[in-house]
Amino acid sequence: MRMILTAFLINFTTQAVAGETALAGTVTHVRDGDTIEVNNVPIRLAALDCPERGTQEGDTASKIAQQFLGSQAKCELTGATTYDRLVGYCEINDTDFGRYMMQNSACKVWEKYDVWNRY
């Protein structure tokens, strides 16, 4: 029952902010190198393609992203969604998170999804 309620709340929260263009708050969870949660809302970083967890490069990217847990984030949402995640470009502690991950890990720009030509 607790898991059902948690899933409902996450889905409801995601739907509630899906129409918004920005989200600001605390990084509450890091799923992997290109997906974080801000105020428990999952955000898929636009234009960022990181290796998957379970690979050496993916685990390293996740570990690098973990250092931002508890930091303040400001995300510009593109209006797109993927699975349970909103898609957006985020700054964490006034640093472009996508650019930081590309400079410090094996993450690369995914040009097809760089909808605002940031990278």
Residue spans for each PLM region:
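Small beta-barrel nucleic-acid-binding modules, primarily SNase/OB-fold domains
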Residues: 2, 11-119
